[in-house]
Amino acid sequence: MNILIIFASYLLGSLPTGFLIGKYLKNIDLRTIGSGSTGATNVLRNVGKWPALFVFIIDLGKGLIAVKIAQYYTDQGLIEVIAGISAISGHIWPIWLRGKGGKAVATGLGMFLALSWKVGLASLGFFLIVLTKTKYVSLSSISAAILLPIFMFFYLGKFMHSYFFISLIVALLVIWKHRTNITRLLKGEESKINQTQ
């Protein structure tokens, strides 16, 4: 059962929501436009506001549902964590798109809302604060990722816990997926949320 949960979580994460929306609404391949990501930000810039919101909600749901399914069928915290990271892996490296997907932000948020809604909401709140102040989605995502393990530590009160370690791994993964954005931010070339790339 555990193997099935993990495999199903990866397939759920692999659902190429942004790619399908781009193809259906504008007949474009988001992998070849803008940032090349199939996530909500690239959808926002190249398809529209409401499609981007739809993609964000579905991508968030992939991480949340994967963990909730694991929680329903098993009481093993480690399986919950592996299910969540499997959904994130599917989102970043979807089998249907030959491994070219999103940057794990929305799916990661969904995962942590399921593991600890307080940590998830704290990360989302900080993301929105930075976004409101700077208008940079990438900077907001990176900032929230950096604080994610800190929020998790204060929630747990200890380092030695699978939730803390997975928060650290996801944070590093999100930062790594934004490495080109970091370069553009340092050069002053990064696009704001209301600008095309």
Curated annotation (Swiss-Prot):
GO CC list: plasma membrane
Leader peptide range in chain numbering: none
Enzyme class: transferase
Primary location recorded for the protein, binned into one broad class: membrane
Keyword Transcription regulation: no
Reactions this protein catalyses: an acyl phosphate + sn-glycerol 3-phosphate = a 1-acyl-sn-glycero-3-phosphate + phosphate
A biological process term (GO) from this entry: phospholipid biosynthetic process
Gene Ontology molecular function terms on file: acyl-phosphate glycerol-3-phosphate acyltransferase activity
UniProt keyword terms in alphabetical order: Cell inner membrane, Cell membrane, Lipid biosynthesis, Lipid metabolism, Membrane, Phospholipid biosynthesis, Phospholipid metabolism, Transferase, Transmembrane, Transmembrane helix
Matches recorded under InterPro entries: G3P_acylTferase_PlsY
EC number of this enzyme: 2.3.1.275
Listed transmembrane segments: 1-21, 50-70, 77-97, 111-131, 137-157, 158-178
Taxonomy, superkingdom: Bacteria
Bilayer topology term: Multi-pass membrane protein
Alphabetical list of Pfam families matching this protein: G3P_acyltransf (PF02660)
Main function: Catalyzes the transfer of an acyl group from acyl-phosphate (acyl-PO(4)) to glycerol-3-phosphate (G3P) to form lysophosphatidic acid (LPA). This enzyme utilizes acyl-phosphate as fatty acyl donor, but not acyl-CoA or acyl-ACP.
Full protein name: Glycerol-3-phosphate acyltransferase
Protein source organism: Prochlorococcus marinus (strain MIT 9301)
